[in-house]
């Protein structure tokens, strides 16, 4: 593997959290996005699987905005990244709350699928969006139309905001997040900084996508310093991401405090 699965889990969660802090440096240390990510991750670790009622109770998801709901499903995408059937089923279980708002359901599926492809090292910028449209399996939704526009603009190396901002708010946020991520896919620093300059997208989603793809190893050291000094739940999120990997791989011991876990692919034994 290009990067360890643990580093990619770290990258996704830290990327989202640090992007939020860079976007809103005046916010308190206890970041809003951490409050979205930690409860769902804790539920998965405690139960060893996704249970809808536990998830909804911990997150109070009906009180979330559509974009917050998309971000809150990131732990699910991490946990079920290697099984697309379970991934889709569990994401839809959460998304079904908005059964009359297909763009929210499509957004949850789109981000979840992209995270999964990054973690399995099957994310290719030129083919990701067509694969997402197929995974959503609901043609002619507002989001799939916008994503297809993004695909065309990426192929043409064209600017994007003037072509996308006429759409609804969550459609705009998700479509632009994919544009900023895919147009500079190997550079988390540039992807996030470009997204911050746009009032129409979510830099947190860009940070999660790029963090999963590039791993924590490629998060700039200056950002890590910001995280160490200004984000109070960083250590908790890192521990939770390690626990998520351990539960996913079947080596988690709920009676032991895991300080550092070496994890290989399932059914493969490797030294630390």
PLM segments and residue spans:
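Structured, active/binding-site neighborhoods that engage oxygen-rich ligands
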Residues: 1-272
């Amino acid at each position: 593997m290009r990067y360890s699965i643990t580093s990619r889990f770290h990258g996704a969660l830290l990327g989202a959290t640090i992007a939020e802090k860079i976007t809103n440096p005046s916010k308190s240390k206890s970041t809003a996005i951490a409050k979205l990510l930690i409860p769902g991750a804790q539920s998965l670790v405690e139960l060893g699987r996704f249970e809808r009622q536990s998830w909804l109770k911990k997150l109070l998801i009906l009180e979330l905005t559509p974009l917050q709901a998309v971000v809150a499903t990131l732990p699910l995408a991490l946990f079920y990244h290697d099984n697309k059937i379970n991934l889709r089923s569990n994401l839809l279980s959460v998304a079904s709350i908005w059964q009359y708002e297909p763009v929210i359901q499509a957004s949850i599926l789109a981000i979840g699928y992209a995270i999964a492809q990054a973690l399995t090292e099957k994310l290719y910028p030129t083919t990701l969006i067509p694969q997402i449209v197929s995974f959503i399996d609901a043609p002619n939704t507002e989001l799939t139309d916008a994503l297809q526009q993004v695909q065309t603009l990426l192929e043409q190396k064209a600017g994007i905001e003037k072509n996308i901002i006429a759409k609804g708010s969550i459609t705009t946020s998700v479509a632009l997040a994919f544009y900023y991520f895919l147009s500079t896919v190997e550079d988390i620093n540039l992807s996030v900084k470009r997204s911050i300059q746009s009032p129409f997208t979510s830099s947190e989603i860009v940070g999660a996508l790029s963090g999963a793809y590039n791993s924590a190893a490629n998060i700039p050291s200056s950002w890590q310093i910001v995280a160490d000094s200004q984000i109070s739940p960083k250590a908790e999120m890192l521990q939770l991401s390690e626990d998520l990997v351990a539960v996913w791989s079947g080596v988690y011991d709920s009676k032991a405090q895991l300080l550092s876990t070496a994890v290989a692919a399932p059914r493969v034994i490797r030294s630390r």
